[in-house]
Curated annotation (Swiss-Prot):
Keywords noted in UniProt: Acyltransferase, Sporulation, Transferase
Function: Probably plays a role in the assembly of the spore coat proteins by catalyzing epsilon-(gamma-glutamyl)lysine cross-links.
UniProt name for this protein: Protein-glutamine gamma-glutamyltransferase
EC number assigned by the record: 2.3.2.13
Family the entry assigns: Belongs to the bacillus TGase family.
Pfam families cross-referenced by the UniProt entry: TGL
MF terms in GO: protein-glutamine gamma-glutamyltransferase activity
Class of enzymatic activity (EC top level): transferase
A GO biological-process term: sporulation resulting in formation of a cellular spore
Catalytic activity: L-glutaminyl-[protein] + L-lysyl-[protein] = [protein]-L-lysyl-N(6)-5-L-glutamyl-[protein] + NH4(+)
InterPro entries documented for this protein: Gln_gamma-glutamylTfrase_bac
Entry-linked NCBIfam families: PRK03187.1
Taxonomic source organism: Halalkalibacterium halodurans (strain ATCC BAA-125 / DSM 18197 / FERM 7344 / JCM 9153 / C-125)
Length: 284
């Protein structure tokens, strides 16, 4: 692999030619250059913006770990009624009289009032990271009528999920536990943010190594299981188009006048790929 794995404005990117990236940014760039994946950016600003979003995803994951939000199933979900309406399916609908940015920030500020499962946690982390990256004014203009439920996202946030053997800091991976105990189906897996030091944050488990995450899930298998939990080769990222749109579109051009379908599957801790299958079955 080499410099041609990253292209900026149609030209190969060289890490040696730049000196103004921070330590974490340079580490991410080096992993991108060493991968078999091809990354293309229309400008250096777009590359810098994606790196900033990745760093903010990791920071938002750490902040969630430090908050007092709890892991729970959809039936027992909870939220602050001053900012969100709790739906009968365990989703959170932002109130029309509050700013979406304030509602997201409240999850971190008043964590004891909130309980949700790990897929919802990832989406909250994404929104918090985007808020850090673009500021409250643009966030509130784009992300109106937020609804939090599993992997459901606002039209302004599209995700890209794919199979690969290598991941980058700021990616989301999935620890699969196919032989989960039927009494605790919410331990069927764990969605986790890849941190820059090689550890992972998973809502409900905290910050752990891959081995620790697997051991934790293994303790929730059914008796006699011969299939241990494992780190799947499944990666989820904010889509390149979303990154580009968040960087380039002006706030007065980014109001979305449509909503996306929601699948209220009532299954905690599913992967993004599984949620996409449910969406396809709905549309199929």
């Amino acid at each position: 692999m080499g410099n041609d794995m990253i292209q900026v404005a149609g030209r190969p990117f060289s890490l040696e030619s730049t000196t103004d990236f921070g330590r974490v940014e340079r580490a991410i760039l080096q992993q991108m250059l060493d991968s078999s994946e091809w990354f293309s950016y229309s400008s250096m600003n777009e590359l810098r913006f994606e790196l900033n979003v990745r760093i903010n995803i990791m920071e938002s994951a750490k902040e969630m770990n430090a908050s007092q939000v709890t892991f729970t199933i959809f039936e027992h979900a909870s939220c602050n009624p001053e900012y969100w309406t709790l739906t009968s399916t365990g989703g959170f609908l932002v109130r029309s009289d509050v700013r979406p940015s304030d509602a997201i920030l409240d999850i971190y500020r008043n964590g004891t009032l909130y309980g949700f499962e790990c897929a919802t946690a990832i989406i909250i982390i994404y929104y918090q990271a985007i808020l850090k990256s673009i500021g409250q004014l643009r966030f509130d203009s784009i992300f109106q009528h937020l609804y939090l439920y599993s992997w459901h996202t606002h039209p302004g946030l599209e995700l890209h999920t794919f199979h690969a053997d290598r991941f980058l800091p700021g990616d989301v991976v999935y620890f699969n536990n196919p032989d989960f105990h039927p009494d605790t189906p919410w331990f069927r897996g764990e969605n986790a943010v890849v941190l820059s030091d090689g550890t992972f944050f998973g809502h409900g488990f905290g910050i752990m190594t891959a081995e620790q995450m697997i051991q934790s899930l293994n303790s929730y298998r059914f008796p006699g299981s011969m299939q241990p939990a494992y780190l799947a080769n499944l990666i989820t990222r904010i889509s390149p188009l979303t990154i580009r749109n968040l960087l380039t579109l002006q706030s007065d051009r980014t109001t979305y006048h449509y909503s996306k379908a929601v699948i209220h599957h009532n299954l905690c801790s599913i992967s993004s790929m599984d949620y996409q299958y449910y969406l396809l079955s709905l549309n199929g």
